[in-house]
């Protein structure tokens, strides 16, 4: 942009009175001085930390805090991740143990196929589960126990859900049914003796009308303590397992599916004593977490202050430009004052502070929100590491990735919106048509995962081969469906997506060689030829520059 002419106009309205008074009482030399001051202020604002140090001796505190925070947050996440891994492993191993303990003849990886097909097998499974529950202390190798309710132990609830009335005669193609569902429950106490006999003489006195039966549920509660955390210098947690064994006969197809669901809750143990230095280690970890919170608070304050300073300078520049050149600053130029990296760091700091507080509460056994804490700490750590890219971006050779992503993002979003319409169309079509015949298309979520893996070229043959050939028309449709999807997304849409990124990359490389297009803001700043170490950016109360804090580029 060439040097803009200073426009002096008459006062035509009350709202321009201040501007007119300024233009009428300000000499050209004073206006040039104000322009130079504004240029220096803007140039200083857009300098990198090293240049700001040479310009005013300002220490790069935010950079130092970010480097310190990366190390501390990463260490914190690793330590919590190891602890959370033990919790998840304990949950999964107990669930597998319960399936082997209470499901007769259960074998690993039978969750989708575990079922019974005769009435006697149903009774046998129920009796086996009840007997295993009553003999828990004699058969379980874990530290499992019944839930205590005062002086009594919790009972197992056996409930059957069935239609209120049902007379079904498939041979005559007739039926009479009342779809209202009724529930009948009774309880088995752990201290009661139990006799295993034939279905006709078993102690349960359970009779099932399989024509009306929908489900049979066996629900009971067990407790356990995760002692493996002691070896890692952590206090153990107490676990409550709410187990539900379901016999599903809703389809009335002759196949009753059996499943075991385990609802797990973690809580603080009531009375405990551990010898050794576990409590001391817990206190040290809480001190470390408190130091992480303090560091993030400092980072949060510094970044918020920088964002506010940017917004204030933005408003000052907009008013200055409107006052001197009677022009509005473009939105793109105004957005350059809003530093997205600082906003990302602010979000990261907030997540880290909340996650660290939760972690301290978990260590103090006041909370057991492991999953929420892991999500907060994991997301914050990811954002912290991404925030470092800002400082790498000050070097031209490392800035190519950032510039390419920034330039390509608008086009990528528009392209993905169009591609998503096609993708969702294929998802719904595959779910409805192929779902009954293909395991990978049974739910909308599974369809999306299957199609996305096909785009990456994964598991193509298995997807074709697992299609059932019970219906030739559907089998033929599946071939047309899969071939068209693969051809469209891999050879066309994915290629166009890569070409979009590649074209942006080449454009950025060309700009780096020949110069980037100048905006009004950058052109205005470029007229300031003062170097950072010229001394013209320094304020009266600035301390002298020390050569030991930063190296001149």
UniProtKB/Swiss-Prot annotation:
Notes on how activity is controlled: Channel activity is activated by PtdIns(3,5)P2 (phosphatidylinositol 3,5-bisphosphate). Inhibited by lumenal H(+) and Na(+). The channel pore shows dynamic behavior and undergoes spontaneous, Ca(2+)-dependent modulation when conducting Ca(2+).
Keyword Glycoprotein part of the UniProt annotation: yes
Q: How is it modified after translation?
A: N-glycosylated.
Subcellular locations according to the entry:
Lysosome membrane; Early endosome membrane; Late endosome membrane; Cytoplasmic vesicle, Autophagosome membrane
The record comments on the domains as follows:
The most N-terminal extracellular/lumenal domain (referred to as I-II linker or polycystin-mucolipin domain) contributes to a structure with a four-fold rotational symmetry in a tetrameric assembly; the structure contains a central highly electronegative pore with a 14 A diameter. The pore is critical for Ca(2+) and pH regulation. The protruding structure formed by the I-II linkers may contain all the interaction sites with lipids and proteins in the endolysosomal lumen.
Name the protein family: Belongs to the transient receptor (TC 1.A.4) family. Polycystin subfamily. MCOLN3 sub-subfamily.
- Put simply, this protein is called Mucolipin-3
> Which source organism?
Callithrix jacchus
């Amino acid at each position: 942009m060439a040097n803009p002419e200073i426009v002096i106009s008459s006062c035509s309205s009350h709202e321009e009175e201040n501007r007119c008074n300024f233009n009428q009482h300000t000499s050209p030399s004073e206006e040039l001085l104000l322009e130079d001051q504004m240029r220096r202020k803007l140039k200083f604002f857009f300098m990198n930390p090293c240049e700001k140090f040479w310009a005013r001796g300002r220490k790069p505190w935010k950079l130092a805090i970010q480097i310190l925070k990366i190390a501390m947050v990463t260490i914190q996440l690793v330590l919590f991740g190891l602890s959370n891994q033990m919790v998840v492993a304990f949950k999964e191993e107990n669930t597998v143990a319960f399936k082997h303990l209470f499901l007769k003849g259960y074998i690993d990886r039978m969750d989708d196929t575990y079922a019974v097909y005769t009435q006697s097998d149903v009774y046998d499974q129920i009796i086996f589960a009840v007997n295993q529950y009553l003999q828990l202390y004699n058969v379980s190798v874990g530290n499992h126990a019944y839930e205590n309710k005062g002086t009594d132990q919790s009972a197992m609830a056996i409930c059957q859900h069935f239609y209120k009335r049902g007379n079904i005669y498939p041979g005559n193609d007739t039926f009479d049914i009342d779809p209202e569902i009724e529930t009948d429950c009774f309880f088995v106490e752990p201290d009661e003796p139990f006799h295993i006999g034939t279905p006709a003489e078993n102690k349960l006195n359970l009779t099932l009308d399989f024509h009306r039966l929908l489900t049979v549920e066996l629900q009971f509660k067990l407790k356990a303590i995760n002692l493996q955390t002691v070896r890692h210098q952590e206090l153990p947690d107490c676990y409550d397992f709410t187990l539900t064994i379901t016999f599903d006969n809703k389809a009335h197809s002759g196949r009753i599916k059996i499943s075991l669901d385990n609802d797990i809750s973690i809580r603080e143990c009531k009375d405990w004593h551990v010898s050794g230095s576990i409590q001391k280690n817990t206190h040290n970890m809480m001190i470390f977490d408190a130091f992480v919170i303090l560091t993030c608070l400092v980072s949060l304050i510094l970044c918020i202050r920088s964002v506010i300073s940017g917004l204030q300078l933005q408003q000052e520049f907009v008013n200055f430009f409107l006052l001197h050149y009677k022009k509005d600053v473009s939105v793109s130029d105004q957005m350059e004052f809003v530093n997205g990296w600082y906003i990302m760091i602010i979000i990261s700091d907030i997540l880290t502070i909340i996650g660290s507080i939760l972690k301290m509460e978990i260590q103090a056994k006041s909370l057991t929100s492991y999953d929420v804490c892991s999500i907060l700490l994991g997301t914050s750590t990811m954002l912290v590491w991404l925030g470092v890219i800002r400082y790498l971006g000050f070097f031209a050779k490392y800035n190519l990735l950032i510039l390419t992503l920034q330039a390509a993002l608008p086009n990528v979003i528009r392209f993905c919106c169009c591609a998503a319409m096609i993708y969702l169309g294929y998802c719904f079509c595959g779910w409805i048509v192929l779902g009954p015949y293909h395991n990978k298309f049974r739910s909308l979520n599974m369809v999306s995962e299957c199609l996305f893996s096909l785009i990456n070229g994964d598991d193509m043959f298995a997807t074709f081969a697992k299609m059932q050939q019970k219906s030739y028309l559907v089998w033929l449709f599946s071939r047309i469906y899969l071939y068209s999807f693969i051809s469209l997304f891999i050879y066309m849409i994915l290629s166009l997506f890569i070409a979009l990124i590649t074209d942006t990359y080449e454009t950025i490389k060309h700009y780096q060689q020949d110069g980037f297009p100048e905006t009004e803001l950058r052109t205005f700043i470029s007229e300031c030829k003062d170097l950072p170490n010229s001394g013209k950016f320094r304020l009266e109360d600035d301390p002298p520059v020390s050569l030991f804090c930063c190296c001149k580029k």
